[in-house]
Amino acid sequence: MLNRLRRPAALLLLALALPAAAATPPSPLKVMSFNVRTPADTAPGKRWMDRREALVTTIRQAHPAVMGTQELVKEQADYLASQLPDYRWFGEGRRGGDDDEHMGVFYDRKVVALEQSGNFWLSDTPDVAGSISWGNLFPRMVTWGLFRRVEDGRRFYLFNTHLPYRDEDEPRRVRGAQAIVAHLKTLPADIPVVVTGDFNSEPGGPTYAAFTGALTDARTQVAAPRGPKNTFHDFTGKATTELDWVLVRGFTARDFATVDARVDGILPSDHFPLVVELDWDAK
């Protein structure tokens, strides 16, 4: 009888002495940033009608959970949504309403759920749609979303923007970066953040420094990023400048790709998109 009582106790002690099984790490989050180029071009191969199927194919092959777009207009957004039925999108035109360019954010509703979303303008009056400050030619803005992943309930923010393009706009790009970073500082520190965009500035400059004081360039976290470093190619296929970045807080990139492939000979846009797989940092 005594031996029978001792046996369960011994098994319990043995179980306590064994190292705890390592928890399975969460699956990575796939994010895409894509300047889709407005439908303004009339030359064959650059026209929206000529390249829209290539753009859909590029997104479908990447299959991101979330995607920040730049230069998107509603005509393009509606077409993409019709061809990508698992995706939903949101965003407001930079002048307010549905007109003009959007910083549209797309998300796979089977992978993530949208909990909150909003917009703010990079100006002295960020809550005023279409507001312009600091000498910008056009309204500049951010569209953001708070997402919850369906499989495990993990939450994250995505912020998406497009900064001014002229060489002399660097001070205005810095002001925009500072405004975005100030906004990020108001968010809960335990919820990871991704910032996607066409920043119209290259790494190493003042705009990059303003961002990377609070965020990390995902490309720098990967030992061997795939594809070219530069992203803007003006429909030549040979990129000359690295204008598009993915910046993170609370994530570490495991894979980073600049997608330079043509689809049936067609370039989807004048920018190469970025596709990044992000691991969640341990809390």
Where do the protein language model's features map onto the residues?
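Hydrophobic h-region of N-terminal signal peptides that target proteins for export
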Residues: 14-22
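Acidic/histidine-rich helix-loop elements
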Residues: 33-53, 122-138, 164-170, 236
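Active site of divalent-metal-dependent phosphoester/diester hydrolases
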Residues: 89-108, 123-127, 133-139, 170, ...
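Structured beta-strand-rich core segments of catalytic domains in phosphoester-bond hydrolases
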Residues: 66-155, 258
